[in-house]
Regions:
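Switch/coupling sub-region of P-loop NTPases
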Residues: 3-114, 118-128
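Conserved P-loop NTPase
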Residues: 121-166
Length: 166
């Protein structure tokens, strides 16, 4: 998400929502970082990711950036934001585009496949722990039926990114 933020217009209002603050957006002039908080020993004062996502919609964002989608309610609110016209960026742990769709449409997130058409692209990245290099493995578009169609994919033998479908 840090890398893609270089393509954001600097004067846009960006709201980021994270469990642990990892994003750094120095070029963004109007960045509002929101971070979850654990409750105190009495069990009060905790701030959940869902609360922050819901509140971010009230802050008139140009873009919403969510560190990681883990729960059904978070995903539902994000997709609702997408369907109402907000630009939303988020991460999810998956090994490829098809697995991303499966993670979103099966428990614990369990969204209906039809609403996935709100997604434009799925970008799958991987960090090679041996070489400590980050690589984009796949770029896929989400079709109206909710399936992913691979557009570009890494050729690991040539270490090049190749067009699969146009």
């Amino acid at each position: 998400l840090n890398a893609i933020s270089n393509f954001f217009v600097p004067n846009q209002r960006i709201i980021s929502v994270e469990d642990t603050r990892e994003l750094v957006l120095p070029k963004i002039l109007h960045w509002v970082p929101l971070e979850t908080r654990l409750p105190n020993p009495e069990g009060k004062g905790g701030i959940q990711m869902l609360d922050l996502i819901v509140n971010s919609l009230r802050m008139r964002p140009d873009r919403i950036v969510v560190g990681e989608i883990r729960r059904k309610m978070e995903a539902e609110v994000l997709f609702e934001a997408m369907h109402t016209g907000h630009s939303v960026y988020g991460t999810l742990h998956a090994n490829n585009a098809k697995e991303t769709i499966n993670r979103l449409t099966n428990p614990p997130i369990d969204l209906p496949k039809q609403i996935l058409s709100a997604l434009s692209l799925i970008v799958v990245q991987h960090i090679n722990r041996r070489t400590v290099k980050r690589r984009t493995l796949q770029i896929a578009e989400v079709l109206p039926n909710g399936d992913a169609r691979i557009l570009m994919q890494l050729n690991p033998i040539k270490d090049t990114f190749e067009i699969v479908n146009e």
